[in-house]
Amino acid sequence: MGRFVAVALLVLLSLSGLETIQHAPKIQVYSRHPAENGKPNFLNCYVSGFHPSDIEVDLLKNGKKIEKVEHSDLSFSKDWSFYLLYYTEFTPNEKDEYACRVSHVTFSTPKTVKWDRNM
């Protein structure tokens, strides 16, 4: 019985330690297909490698939040870091700028990554 209690305590201590670990998210912004002006596409923001799981992600058009955005379920990797995909339909053109803005405890201010149509 004592051995079980010791093992259970060790597991609980290990899990509680995960909350103190913080990893900044890696942010990747890309389109599903190569960009062509006037041709519908999907804008993706893949956020990965972050911990803890609390995060806010916005897709932006000319600095303003895009309202019709979908996202995957929050998932985690084998190292217990988390990842998400946010995406929306869009039609690229020469004048509009697109970006992904992420707020996470590891950032003092939200981080914005612009979409590069050549990537």
Curated annotation (Swiss-Prot):
Q: What is its main location?
A: secreted
Record-level GO BP terms: antigen processing and presentation of peptide antigen via MHC class I; immune response
Entries under SMART domains matching the protein: IGc1
Q: State the signal peptide span.
A: 1-20
Per the record, the domain of life is Eukaryota
InterPro entries xref list: B2Microglobulin (IPR015707), Ig-like_dom (IPR007110), Ig-like_dom_sf (IPR036179), Ig-like_fold (IPR013783), Ig/MHC_CS (IPR003006), Ig_C1-set (IPR003597), MHC/Immunoglobulin (IPR050160)
Q: Which residues form the Ig-like C1-type domain?
A: 25-114
> What pairs make up the disulfide bonds?
C45-C100
* Subcellular location(s) per record: Secreted
A single GO cellular-component term on record: MHC class I protein complex
Q: Which UniProt keywords apply?
A: Disulfide bond, Immunity, Immunoglobulin domain, MHC I, Secreted, Signal
Read off the Pfam families from this record.
C1-set
What assembly does the database describe for this protein?
Answer: Heterodimer of an alpha chain and a beta chain. Beta-2-microglobulin is the beta-chain of major histocompatibility complex class I molecules.
Q: Which function does this protein serve?
A: Component of the class I major histocompatibility complex (MHC). Involved in the presentation of peptide antigens to the immune system.
Q: Member of which family?
A: Belongs to the beta-2-microglobulin family.
**Know the name of this protein?**
Beta-2-microglobulin
